[in-house]
Structures are given as structure tokens and as C-alpha cells.
Amino acid sequence: IDLDTMQLINTTPVLELNTHLSFPAILRREGHIYIYPENYAGGGLNLYEYLPESNECKKIKHLSDELVTDAVYTELFGEPLIFSTCEPDANGAVLGVYQQNKSTGMYQLVQECKFGEPIARNAGAWFTYRGEIYRPAQDSAVRYGHKLVIQRVRREADGCFSFREVR
């Protein structure tokens, strides 16, 4: 991208697989850049490290065998968690909470958050604002990704998560 004109000059793929890749979520940790793209057709969720010197990605860890879609990793609740919908109902009303198994390192489903409508699928990274946690979500009532909604997220005393749409 030309920073003066904001025009796209060139594109170079950094990760190419024989299966579908999308939703390239990015983590930055201790000077490293990690990417975990949606790739349920490839058999689950994998973590890649982006190597700027070669402009490519190297697979470093298999995170989950679940066929997660638009997964979001967060530590906003004091522990590493992944929130995601899952095939075959990726655009539905159930958001899975995945926790890391300490012995295997894999993320496993530990909770399901059920909505009354198809708004479970993530639409980007979660964020904080004025001490509250928010998540962008896709409203797929009409069709996949028809609208974007923002939900305030809280972890209740019983450990379950609650979501409230904000306007």
C-alpha cells in the first residue's frame, strides 16, 4: 500500500493451501506475528507464524480439530479462550467456547452460548471500551453476514457468558 495515496500497489500471498482460507485473525506477541485463518476444510484450526524476512507463514501448532468458523482468540477474561461457531451450522445461533487442554495443548469445546436468532458468528476481533468487553457479530437472519451487530460480553459468576446487543 502506498501510504501517501492509500492505493494498493501489490499483493503477495503469504499462505497458500489447497483448501479455503478466510478470516485471517492476527495476534502480535513479543515481537512475533501469528495468524490463525479459518480453514475448516483443512481439518481444523492451525496457528501460523508470519516470517517478514521471507514474507511467508510457517505452521507452528494445530489448535483444534473442531471445524470452527471465524474463530476469535482472546485473553480478555483472564485466560486464553477461543470463541467460534462450528460447521455444519456456522451461521447459526450457537457460539462455542473453547478452552486449552493443559495436557494436549488443543482447544476443546467447554461451553455453548445459545442465542435466540442466528447472530453467533464472529465478525472481527473482540475489544474493550470503557472497561467493558465487546464483540462484533454477524446477523445472518436474512443471509450470511447480512448485518453487523455489536454485543457487550460479560462472564457471569457461574462462569457462563452473557451477550447484550448495544446500539
Model-predicted segments: where are they?
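Carbohydrate-active catalytic/glycan-binding domains of CAZyme proteins
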Residues: I1-R167
